[in-house]
């Protein structure tokens, strides 16, 4: 039988067909590094009529009225991330991409983009409509011409979902070492950081409901985690002294949250990977939601704090671990090679049957 030669031929043909982009892969951005990279991460769908000052990642579809992205000039991403990444489709009103930030879209751009500022690069897996190219570089149909394009985006989403779920869970198991006290209508958070600069608070949604003001004393803490239990969360408190770039060091973790509503300007990064959220005012910091209806701005002051080790193993302000390690997922290049190899094998076997018949 010629079965083995056919397999070898198919795999060899597949290896020749694989593009360099398919055969290579960069290190995934996961865990706390995702909060450092993106101003807003929505693992599912984002409906927006507002704006994001930094970078945005959407794991599902982007819809809603006209919205704005990367409205503040940003240093170039060391990992090459554009101002806007959407794994699914872009629908609704025109989306404004600013400061030459560019976009990557796995599906179709039905709404159209306004490409403002310096020349931008837009990569689209499907079709793009209602967009004036001018001096910009707009590539569409990449889902057909490069199989790795859409596969890579889907795997990027899967790794973010896995690692951010794990990060929220791990943070939720950290032992509290700092003091929360209610003083009249005010909740006072007094950080008592450990040797690694980590301060941890543990409160409930009921505790938040009892107060109308929030005050922080960070006391030199590099990383502050506020674990909040409860499924339904209302964030309607005022921050004494303003939001004050709290999001660079403070993470509000909602590991149990299913619904979150933000009605006041919120200080601190938010980690709620399973929550359906709605914002009516700005958040200063990074934010992670399951799905989001956005009517309030996202302000930079994204997370810059230290890393958090696994519970029981201490914490780290540096090092290689950023917390929330994802469940391993095969690299896009391996999937592409496997798929092309199988396709070549099937074709070869069918050709042999036709020849022998």
Give the ranges of each region predicted by the language model:
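Bacterial N-terminal signal peptides that target proteins for export
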Residues: 1-8
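Bacterial N-terminal signal peptides
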Residues: 8-17
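Sec/Tat signal peptide C-region and signal peptidase I cleavage site
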Residues: 18-23
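Long, polar low-complexity repeats
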Residues: 24-101, 106-113, 159-310
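Hydrophobic alpha-helical segments and helix pairs
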Residues: 114-168
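Ser/Thr/Gly/Pro-rich low-complexity, disordered linker/stalk segments of secreted
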Residues: 308-326
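A short, hydrophobic C-terminal helix/tail in secreted or cell-surface proteins
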Residues: 330-348
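C-terminal membrane-anchoring or membrane-association module
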Residues: 345-357
């Amino acid at each position: 039988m010629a079965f083995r030669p056919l397999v070898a031929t198919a795999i060899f043909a597949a290896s020749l067909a694989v593009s360099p982009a398919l055969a290579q892969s960069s290190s995934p951005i996961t865990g706390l590094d995702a909060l450092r990279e993106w101003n807003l991460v929505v693992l599912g769908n984002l409906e927006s009529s507002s704006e994001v000052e930094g970078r945005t990642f959407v794991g599902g579809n982007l819809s809603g009225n006209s919205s704005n992205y990367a409205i503040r000039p940003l240093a170039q991403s060391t990992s090459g991330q554009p101002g806007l990444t959407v794994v699914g489709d872009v629908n609704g009103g025109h989306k404004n991409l600013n400061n030459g930030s560019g976009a990557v879209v796995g599906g179709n751009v039905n709404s159209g983009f306004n490409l403002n500022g310096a020349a931008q690069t837009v990569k689209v897996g499907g079709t793009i409509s209602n967009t004036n190219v001018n001096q910009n570089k707009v590539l569409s149909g990449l889902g057909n011409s490069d199989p790795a394009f859409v596969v890579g985006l889907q795997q990027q989403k899967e790794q973010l979902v896995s690692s951010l779920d794990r990060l929220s869970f791990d943070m939720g198991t950290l032992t509290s070492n700092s003091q929360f006290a209610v003083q009249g209508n005010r909740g006072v958070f007094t950080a008592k950081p450990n040797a690694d600069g980590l301060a941890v608070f543990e409160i409930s949604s009921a505790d938040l409901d009892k107060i109308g003001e929030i005050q922080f004393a960070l006391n030199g803490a590099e990383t502050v985690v506020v674990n909040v239990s409860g499924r339904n969360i209302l964030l309607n408190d005022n921050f004494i002294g303003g939001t004050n770039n709290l999001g660079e060091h403070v993470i509000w973790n909602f590991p149990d949250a299913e619904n979150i509503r933000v009605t006041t300007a919120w200080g601190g990064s938010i980690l709620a990977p399973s929550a359906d959220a709605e914002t009516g005012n700005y958040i200063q910091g990074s934010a992670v939601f399951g799905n989001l209806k956005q009517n309030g701005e996202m302000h930079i002051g994204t997370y810059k704090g230290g890393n958090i080790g696994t519970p029981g193993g201490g914490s780290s302000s540096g090092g290689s671990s950023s917390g929330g390690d994802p469940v391993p997922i095969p690299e896009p290049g391996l999937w592409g090679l496997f798929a092309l190899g199988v396709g070549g094998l099937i074709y070869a076997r069918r050709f042999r049957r036709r020849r022998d018949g």
